[in-house]
Amino acid sequence: LRFFLADKPDAIVVEFFSGSGTTAHAVFRLNRQDDGRRSSISVTNNEVAANEQKALRESGLRPGDAEWEQWGICEYVTKPRIRAAVTGRTPEGQSIKGEYKFTDEFPMADGFEENVEFFTLTYESPLRVSSNREFAKVAPLLWIRAGSRGRRIDDISRGWEVTDTYGVLADLNLTQDFLNAVRADEAILLAYIVTDEDRL
């Protein structure tokens, strides 16, 4: 990755079929080497290996069951690996032994100064989202689109909210209050309007 991203400290790396999370791990390491702020988005389908699927089906389990999903590559390999890379600790809480080698040697137990979020994508009813009953489920996507920096807006029950780099307006009757808050903060780069109002 260094060959392609060395001169792109703010790059966004998207990997589909991310497997064990090697690309995200490499982005963390590259950021540490050059103080970059690259983001990595890893997408996987949490596939369970064919031989394990057979045994799980024979025991009465099906895709979607928690006991099935725990053996998928994302749940069993990717998430634990990424958490361990960032924290420097195993899933059992022990410091990781060993050091990273070559370009920059340092203990794996040091971890990385990275923010990590895991999301399970689902299909949501537009009516429930537009009426704010499911806003928390789309909130992470808005935060990612706004740059994945700072606090995430998870609740807009008061009609609007502003955070470090973006704002969300849900009640058009409160537009002026929202605009005043946005104007008062030069760091805000993006505003979302979440509504089903016909007057727009």
Name each region found by the language model.
Residues L1-A11, N31-L200:
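Accessory, often C-terminal, charged low-complexity segments
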Residues D10-G19:
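Conserved class I S-adenosyl-L-methionine
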Residues A26-L30:
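Hydrophobic residues on the short alpha-helix immediately C-terminal to a glycine-rich phosphate/catalytic loop
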